[in-house]
């Protein structure tokens, strides 16, 4: 459970990342996948992560303290927004590569995918990148409330096939609107924190 959550800092530069031994779980996904809403649902604080009306605007890693230093959530910039210029895309790729490969605090990643849509090439590349570097990853399928019940199994199958899902990974379907499976996400955070 998350009893306390607070914003600490934002930074794109490794030299400004927090230098300690506190474990981190990173959240990443396409622009408008519902990442900020998911953070707010997890922390039960609708004002913690700002929900941007401008996709692709955030280019920083946002660090949130959880349970007074027990661990941190790290909110990564949304990717895949077409109107972001190439220089920003390159900066984003370099920052995330540096964070994922060299950040010793990182214990795992929640990769958010919209359950309504087939994963993009960016989604596939992100998942395969994390698998290549043996970074523990959980797939969080968002916007469950937007699906008909008849689509639940079909859409999950479509996503798993598209990204070449590894069966050892966890796949959770959530709704930020009605908090479906948020408790399951707490369990998976605990699992990731104990995995390395």
Curated annotation (Swiss-Prot):
Binding site for GTP: 29-36, 56-60, 75-78, 142-145, 174-176
A cellular component annotation (GO) from this entry: cytosol
Record keywords, A-Z: Cell cycle, Cell division, GTP-binding, Magnesium, Metal-binding, Nucleotide-binding, Septation
HAMAP family named in the record: GTPase_EngB
Originating organism: Mycoplasma mycoides subsp. mycoides SC (strain CCUG 32753 / NCTC 10114 / PG1)
UniProt cross-references to InterPro entries, sorted A to Z: G_ENGB_dom (IPR030393), GTP-bd (IPR006073), GTP-bd_ribosome_bio_YsxC (IPR019987), P-loop_NTPase (IPR027417)
Name of the protein in its database record: Probable GTP-binding protein EngB
Residue ranges constituting the EngB-type G domain according to the UniProt record: 21-195
Essential cofactor(s): Mg(2+)
GO BP: division septum assembly
MF annotations from Gene Ontology: GTP binding; metal ion binding
Its job: Necessary for normal cell division and for the maintenance of normal septation.
Residues reported to bind Mg(2+): 36, 58
Entry's family note: Belongs to the TRAFAC class TrmE-Era-EngA-EngB-Septin-like GTPase superfamily. EngB GTPase family.
